[in-house]
Swiss-Prot record:
Assigned GO CC terms: cytoplasm
Catalytic reaction equation(s): 7-phospho-2-dehydro-3-deoxy-D-arabino-heptonate = 3-dehydroquinate + phosphate
Gene Ontology biological-process annotations: amino acid biosynthetic process; aromatic amino acid family biosynthetic process; chorismate biosynthetic process
Transmembrane segments: none
Annotated protein name in UniProt: 3-dehydroquinate synthase
Organism (species): Bacillus anthracis
Amino acid sequence: MGNIHIQTKSKEYDVYVGKESLSHLTTIVQNMQPSVSNIMIISDEAVASLHLQTVVDALQIDQKVFSFVVPSGEKEKSFENFYAAHTSALENKLDRNSLIIALGGGMIGDLAGFVAASFMRGIRFVQVPTTLLAHDSAVGGKVAINHPLGKNMIGAFHQPEAVVYHTPFLQSLPEKEWRSGYAEVIKHALIGDVKLYHWLKEEVQTLADLRDEKLIHILMKAIPVKANIVAQDETEKGVRAHLNFGHTLGHALEKELGYGNITHGDGVAVGMLFAIFLSEQVYKVNLAYEEMKQWFLNYGYPKMPSDLSVERLVGLMKQDKKANAGTIHMVLMQEYGVVNVVSIPDETVHIALEAFQKDMVEK
């Protein structure tokens, strides 16, 4: 088991990673000042059926604990569920000394975190992630819900009190969720830890390798990449945007295909490949795109669908949060471990995306 210390301008906290990390939860709650009055656990139906009682049992405390459970799926990160969670919080008499526990993947972490950020103008919360994907979203304090016109468009920055990464919770994940989360691991390696990238290529031949000590090693290496960036730029005014590598096209694919029809990680994987494809053209460098593409395909990541409208995707990319005055801004790779936010003309993106789509179909 290991701990990773997160330090931002607004808060310091620890990420507990390992097979016994849930044992820290009671101590975390008991050490909070002022004392916690009561606890609301927010989860989804799939996770709650597997792990909710385990977390309740681990909370060896006197305070009242109740739960708010939503259906599973990215589409449930909605204003309706956000509002319903506030109603439940009020009905159960949460106050400013209450605590929210986010038990689930990235969708629940975002939803519960935004409820915590907005209820009575902000109360405390703890992240208890249950997916590999959430190694990214549970750290750093970005919380949000989706709008029909865009992903994560309504949200806030609200840091948790702690992150409890109990790795046994991940064992119930289906393969598509392992693959989805692993895309963010690859992202962290590509933008901030080249040694980790080479280790992944050697040690993770299939998704089945993401278990036990290898899993803990990956988490202990990938999370600090994000932690170091967040420490420099908590509210995404500069280098934190580098964490969006692959996300400009990735989010556009999620929106165009419909939330839940493609996992976040699959979208980001396609987005990273496109970013590398475009980076080779912009920077006139060899980033081994063909080798990278084959590596991704070997894990089962999808190709870009051939029937999608490039024009529509470019339009969605212009709605990305990094866009400025209608101009697409993408995170491009100058070399492994070195990325930059670059303004790209629509025509350049359109031509490159058409070529990328054609390449993915033909090969």
